[in-house]
UniProtKB/Swiss-Prot annotation:
The gene is ITEVIIR. The lineage of its organism: Viruses, Duplodnaviria, Heunggongvirae, Uroviricota, Caudoviricetes. SMART domains: GIYc, IENR1, IENR2. It is an enzyme of class 3 (hydrolase). Residues 14-96 form the GIY-YIG domain. This endonuclease is specific to the nrdD gene splice junction and is involved in intron homing. GO terms for molecular function: DNA binding; endonuclease activity. This is Intron-associated endonuclease 2. GO terms for biological process: intron homing. Disulfide bonds: none annotated.
Amino acid sequence: MKWKLRKSLKIANSVAFTYMVRFPDKSFYIGFKKFKTIYGKDTNWKEYNSSSKLVKEKLKDYKAKWIILQVFDSYESALKHEEMLIRKYFNNEFILNKSIGGYKFNKYPDSEEHKQKLSNAHKGKILSLKHKDKIREKLIEHYKNNSRSEAHVKNNIGSRTAKKTVSIALKSGNKFRSFKSAAKFLKCSEEQVSNHPNVIDIKITIHPVPEYVKINDNIYKSFVDAAKDLKLHPSRIKDLCLDDNYPNYIVSYKRVEK
């Protein structure tokens, strides 16, 4: 692959860029990539072929043009430009992007925590209401056949009021989002992580699940529902709800029983 760069753009001293991948069938993908990590080290941007599964699949059948659209001296500026471009072309029939931005991932782009966030983001693809209902129906049917009442199962499925996140910091500077990944790195059991001499901090945080999200006059049951309607990433909706500069974005949390 070979990147095309306009003569007016200078890579030197830039840390990130936005790009477009164009295919012969007119389809295209807009993305963001770093020239350098937060530690100032060069990345593999010259060999980078996108994290999009759709792009990777199309590359098996087509040759693509890789175009650097703009260069930036900060990750945040590049992400904002990426979001602006995707919004501009989101209704274009040839665009391959399925969501607008992954805004919160710019904080620690090379940490283990960031990698885990990306992994979780791909695992938690937004499902349609029809798909969710089918999953619920199958669960209810399964437990019904195992001597559990439908009311009990429905209550069990919808009973989650909070989710737990873990942050484990090591002396080496590495951070992990689970005891399993930390144990693998430290070559010990999960039970031994808490008392391991290389562990300097363990934080366990309970994040309440929204009771509702209100944006302008519209009320949604979750960040995901709001994101689907506004064509934003759920994490971006959450960030806006917590930002004092956006008073029209409101979130109300359920009370967590202790």
